[in-house]
């Protein structure tokens, strides 16, 4: 036998399996991976593909017709309940959109992420892999003109229409990602659906849910249908429902409407032994081809399917939109029972036979009704009960509130209406869309810049104000940004991070310039920052004119939901070297989070930090990280001095360091962890050394300008 016989020709571990990573060797090292996800190396479409343009070619009428036909085209390999896939498709859409949380804007239906781990294998998403496979022929037919994200969101909407609901509308424009997100924190738990009393719980104190999470445990979309930690108690469950839905930007009325509307159709599946289900998709064998939860010992389909473990329908007619949910919930008394799969569920006492839904396969058989603990909360919680009673008495009002809430659920993470595409986009402006009126594009931009330059405002004031206006942008749900100039409105004008006194002084000047020139305040704020950068670059010997596109509008107080905007408050900003208070996460980790939400890369983050420091934009005017004797000049001094071995770095307090001359021990500068990480982290140091090079002084300026412009234009969807 030769030396190579019987041995794998591939070196084990390094490239094809999960090996010990750098992060595991050095768990305290800063992980920059969240800044390099979704790049072109994983995207097979190529740099010239533009989904927003491609989807405009979609034959929406034909697609709608195909989806309508699919709803009643039952397949033997996964039969439709009562011959209609509506309930399954609604659950598919709901569980895609329902991962959204308002705190950081992450999650939601906007990326098609349900195709990938962990979502494709969450316990709460059991058997949704079958729904996506049922949709595959439609995706295959319409190809690049229809993303998975749009199709998944649209399927539930058409399902409702096919069952009799007049929907509020629909917008296309969601672009697919091609691998799981690395930036979404789903929770601290290390197992699926553990009790909240376990170690690594997301709850503290009096059932206080960790931010930014909007689900009660790992693997569930919202709440446990059996009750808190699987223990039925509708009033306790009502608390969980209220918290999780509020964190998804839904009020009590929307919560009741979505709960009732979601359970007006379809059924729960638990007529079998859940222990007989095979592994989830990510753990399934290769021959299962990405399908999970397969029952290989029994049929496991149709009336014998097991999903949540609860068993039964909520209404007598589960394939049609009606008011049966409230009629059943409010008119019957309910008692706790166990499903065939052993799950807690509520069943009616002495139901009338005509109220019992028929079997999914045999219409001559009647099955019992069921309510989850969350459904019972709609009856037992006093506020939810009032809303339920109103909906019961006014079915038309219920249908309208639900249709609007469903539209909000499926579009909350799409951003402003400028991103909406398709023939069914509603004309009505909705407050949660953060509407912005169109701005003036026809004014003398240079005249505005000249007035700004002559205003007497400092470079620091100009740049800081523009940055503060733009930094609220979140690429996760496309909210925030400089467009709208909401920095001049409540609540933003009073945020500590925006230095209200300085902001008021600068805005008073810039608003006057806007009024005199016909430009929007939003445009003038951005132009002010550009003027400051151009002046600083000129002082450094680089003549450059920053790109600028007029047309931002000015939002009004009436167009601004102050409560909704509160979540955009910057409680930390490493770019301005500021923390509102101490946090469990390190300052540099918080910087990465803001950078990722801004849609920036690690090199862009690096060059922006270096530039903003020497421009003197620190919050409160602190000098931490201002490694230059030429403040206000756009030099690469931050990087030159950071990488200079003539200096020694010493701790001088919590998140504070002194930079001392090695020979004299004289303190030269002070710094924070955010400053020093650009010299301590090996990747960031590589970028810092690049910008510290003698031949890259002009490159530094031009790269800073490019990154700055990217932030200023991040929310300009009208330019796409």
Swiss-Prot record:
Instruction: Briefly state the modifications made to the protein after translation.
Output: Formation of the three residue Trp-Tyr-Met cross-link is important for the catalase, but not the peroxidase activity of the enzyme.
One annotated GO molecular function: catalase activity
Q: Which GO terms describe its biological process?
A: cellular response to hydrogen peroxide; hydrogen peroxide catabolic process
- The record's top EC class is oxidoreductase
Q: What is its EC number?
A: 1.11.1.21
Record GO cellular component, one term = cytosol
- Give a yes or no for keyword Heme in this entry: yes
What Gene3D superfamilies does the record tag this protein with?
1.10.520.10, Peroxidase, domain 2 (1.10.420.10)
Transition state stabilizer (site feature) positions: 91
Share the entry's pH-dependence remark: Optimum pH is 6.5 for catalase activity. Active from pH 4.5 to 8.5.
What cofactor(s) does the depicted protein rely on? heme b
Statement: the UniProt record of this protein carries the keyword Oxidoreductase: yes
Q: So where's the catalytic machinery, residue-wise?
A: 95 (proton acceptor)
| General function of this protein | Bifunctional enzyme with both catalase and broad-spectrum peroxidase activity.
Stored PANTHER family: CATALASE-PEROXIDASE, HYDROPEROXIDASE I, BIFUNCTIONAL CATALASE-PEROXIDASE
Please state which protein family the record places this protein in.
Belongs to the peroxidase family. Peroxidase/catalase subfamily.
Protein name listed in UniProt: Catalase-peroxidase
Which organism's genome codes for this protein?
A: Synechococcus elongatus (strain ATCC 33912 / PCC 7942 / FACHB-805)
Higher taxonomy: Bacteria, Bacillati, Cyanobacteriota, Cyanophyceae, Synechococcales
